[in-house]
């Protein structure tokens, strides 16, 4: 199983989304689904598949003359790992601001909103008054932005 989900390129994410949706897919089906959307050559798509196999995100099974591909990492796990990796690079003081911007720019269902409200209410009970800045000492504007 792959460990560095953040190493998936934007193009590889497109391949993975199809694999996650279909469960199992062969290269011909991937090509047929991706070409109208992205206008990629067969060889480009096969290269992306090969990279995902090498990175450990796809498993290959031979069936006759065809190769079938299945994901080795569940979609939700890949998304959570990629998000966590991004947030590891942010200053602690800017994570809330980033989440707020993301929520503002995202279409959410009523169920999603209710779930977020419940999560935030639970977190509020134990949240610190202030989150510490973890930038270089005296070298950032975090404290000034408050």
UniProtKB/Swiss-Prot annotation:
SUPFAM superfamilies membership:
Winged helix' DNA-binding domain
Does the record's keyword annotation contain Isomerase? no
Annotated GO molecular function terms are: DNA binding
Record key words, sorted: DNA-binding, Transcription, Transcription regulation
Q: Which GO terms describe its biological process?
A: negative regulation of DNA-templated transcription
What Gene3D superfamilies does UniProt report for this protein, alphabetically?
Answer: Winged helix-like DNA-binding domain superfamily/Winged helix DNA-binding domain
Q: Which domain of life is it from?
A: Bacteria
Query: Hey, which family's this protein in?
Result: Belongs to the BlaI transcriptional regulatory family.
What name is this protein filed under? Uncharacterized 16.5 kDa protein in ptsI 3'region
Give the taxonomic lineage as stored in the record.
Bacteria, Bacillati, Bacillota, Bacilli, Lactobacillales
């Amino acid at each position: 199983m792959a460990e560095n989900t953040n190493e998936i390129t934007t193009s590889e994410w497109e391949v993975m989304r199809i694999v996650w949706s279909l469960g199992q897919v062969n290269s011909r089906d991937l090509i047929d689904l991706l070409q109208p959307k992205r206008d990629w050559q067969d060889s480009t798509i096969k290269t992306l598949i090969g990279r995902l196999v090498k990175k450990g995100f796809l498993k290959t099974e031979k069936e006759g003359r065809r190769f079938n591909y299945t994901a080795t990492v569940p979609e939700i796990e890949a998304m959570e790992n990629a998000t966590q990796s991004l947030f590891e690079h942010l200053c602690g003081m800017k994570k809330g601001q980033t989440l707020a911007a993301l929520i503002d720019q995202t279409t959410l269902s009523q169920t999603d909103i209710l779930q977020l409200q419940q999560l935030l209410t639970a977190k509020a009970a134990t949240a610190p008054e202030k989150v510490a800045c973890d930038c270089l000492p005296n070298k950032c504007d975090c404290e000034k932005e408050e």
